[in-house]
Each structure stands twice: as structure tokens, then as C-alpha cells.
Amino acid sequence: LGRMGQTLRDQVPAAGSTWGGWLPPGIHPDPRPPDEADVVVVGGGVVGWSVAYWLKMLEGRFRRHGMKVLVVERDPTYSRASTVLSVGGIRQQFSLPENIRMSRFSASFLRDINEHLGVPNEPPIDIQFQPSGYLFLASQEGAAKLEATVQLQRDEGAQVVLLSPTQLKEKFPWINTEDVAVASYGLEDEGWFDPWTLLNAFRRKATSLGVHNCCGEFCSWPCMCSWNKTLQVCAHPSQIYMPDSLEYQPVACSIVVNAAGAWAGKLLEADGLPGKLCQPPLPIQPRKRYVFSWHCPDGPGLSCPFLVDTSGAYFRRDGIAGNYLGGMSPPEEEEPDPSDLSVDHDYFQEQLWPRLARRVPSFESLRVRGAWAGYYDYNTFDRNGVLGPHPRLENLFLAAGFSGHGLQHSPAAGRAVAELVVRGRFESLDLRRLGWARLEDREPLHEGGVV
């Protein structure tokens, strides 16, 4: 206990200090970036680190000299990072085949995470996975759509069942089924896990493979219209702003991967690309989402799934002591100001709690414990990720816009982008439809399963 207490004291700021100089355990960025890199990954969230990891795993013919990969993250404390502020869910229940396939890939990856991300002489990785199906409820108006979506999920190999109101009540007697026409329930490869552990596992493994990382802000693109297939010549400098020294550090690179999450769209707008190269604009915006925590000793208990209500409200169990997490996305016209991560507690009282209590009567007596806010990297075009090369800057690749499911799809998305960079094509999963072309052609791939 004494050693544990000392460890905790070593990992938090001293009294009276600020969080500005504090770094999470295990996070030690290089003081300065290297002068050159084959690939610069902008964004050190879980998607960015997944890309970096897979680049090193797939470097193949470059293995003799090694592919030099640099990850640039402007906030090494991760205090505003979408990854660590997520509720950590993974599910197979999506409405787009590509998303289902990425979920299946990621579930397999997480199941064998120590084979993929284990580092010699370091403790085994425990992402604290809690297996529990997602439970989607549908009213009469949404029943046919849910049934069709479940058939698609089954066709893709997902284990999902449909439940009638009677079956739903038998399995989860604490649910009010009054307005429920049908429900879908995942039988495997669904649940939740610790986001920070996955992020740090990707980072530790990638750095053990030789990936560099620095704290800084990417400020300019290496504008060229064709990229060096050998990845050996790095003659196109980008600028990285170093907040500690207030200097700009040039980094010559061949390829840039934009994995900046909620700020991926703004990154393209702000960093000096000629006007024609910014068209069409990348439709990714930061959207603030609240997560509330509450205690209810008479709540659903251990049988609680990750429930998504007909109203859009969701909740899941948090441990085994009667605690729960939940939230709800607001309508478009009521989006909160994303300029900070303050929480509107009236939103819980006026919008979320009535919906929770209607579905689970015991939640009438819940007691709020806390709340936080995080960001979705929200794709306003179709709520799906954008993966692949820029149409006119072939050395610029995109991996952003997942609209809330980037964490769970990070193993698959990182592999996909790395395959494009190293091999010039998708190999593990065919994700061509998620490329930039759909933005230019104005052909959205709508995902109906965004929570």
C-alpha cells in the first residue's frame, strides 16, 4: 500500500501546481522533432498512434533502414483528447458494411492485444474489457429499419438477435417496454474497455518499434502533387511550432497523415494550402458531447447492457456498485458551443434524466455523481470516417471524421491507412467507399448507428 500511495503521488501534480507541465504516466515526447521523417502523423490520439504502429509493422522492404515515422501531438497531457474522454464502447451494430467490418477487425485485434501490442519486459496489457451486448430499442416507426440493419449485420458475420417486447421484458425485467416494438442485442464482440490503456498500448509499442513523437503544432504542408514511391527522399519541409521554445522547427517529409480528430478540418483550412486544394472542404467539426455519471443502487445491476433508447439517450453500467454512465446527442439546432469543455448540468436535468427515468423507472431516484465533456470528430456530410489520400495532394492522407466511433475502429483504420501508404492499396478490408471521392461526388454514405 505504501508503494502504491507513493506511485500515485508521483503521478499527479503537486499541491499548488498547474496541470500545464504535467504529463500522463508513460508519456515522454522527444524535446525536438527530427530534421526529417518519411511519414509525419499529425495527431497523437488513438487513431494517429494506430497509424504509426501499423506503418512500422508493414514497413517491409524498408525494414533494412527503417521507415522514420514522427507523431506530432499538440496536447501531450491529453486533457482535451477525444480518446481518453470517450465512454469506451465497441459494437458490431452499425448500418454500413464498412463500419461492421472495421468493428469485427478491431474486436479480433483487442482480443489478442498482447500478441499485437505487447512489449518485451513490460507487464501484460489489460484494457479492462467488459463484455456486454449493445441493446438498441426501436419504436414502431423505426422497427422495419432496425430489422433490415440487423439482417445486414448478420450477413457480415455479426452475432445479433432481435427481441420482441415480451422477450425484452423477460431478459431485462427492469425496462419499460411500453413504446418498444423491437430491440436488437449483440451476443459477442461488444462491450466497453479503458480508452487510455489502448492509447498508451499503441504508443508504447510504436515507440518500441522506433516511432518518434514530439509535442508541437503542425503548421504547414509539404505541398507536392506526387509522392516519392521509395519513401527515401525527404525534401519537402513542414513547419512544427514548438510551444516550449516558441520556435518553428522544419521537418522534411514525404508523406503527412492528418489524424487530428475533431480538428482535422480546421487543420486543412489553416495551414497554407492553395485555395483549389482545399475544395471540397473537409466537413469535420468538433462537436461537444456530455457524459454524466450517476449512482442508483436499485438500478439494472450486473445485467445492464449498453442500452441505446428510442430517444437517442444511452447508458451503461460503470463497475459493479450501482454506478452508471450515459449521455445523449442533441439535435442539430441545439449543438453546444465547442469552444471549451464546460458541462451544462441543466441538460441532464431537463433532457436526459426524463428519458432515462421513462425507460428505467428505478432511475427516478438516481443521484448524479459527476460529468465531463469530450469531442466527436463529427463528419457533417455523412457521419463516417474519411480514409485515404487527398484527391490533389497525393502525399497527404486522411484518417478522421469517425463521429464518435474512432476509438473502437482505430485498429482497423490505422491498418487501412498504413496499407495505403506502404502498399498503395487496401488489403485487409476494402474501405474504398470511405475515401474522399464521395465528398467530391456528393454521394454520402449515411451511418444510421451514430450514438
Question: Can you name each region flagged by the protein language model?
Answer:
Residues 56-83:
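Glycine-rich FAD pyrophosphate-binding loop
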Residues 239-303, 345:
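Central helical "cap/lid" subdomain
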Residues 87-171, 312-314:
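Dinucleotide-binding Rossmann-like beta1-alpha1 core, especially the glycine-rich loop
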Residues 154, 166-170, 192, 286-287, ...:
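Flavin (FAD/FMN) cofactor-binding core of flavoprotein oxidoreductases
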Residues 1-39, 57-67, 448:
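Extreme N-terminal leader/targeting segments of oxidoreductases
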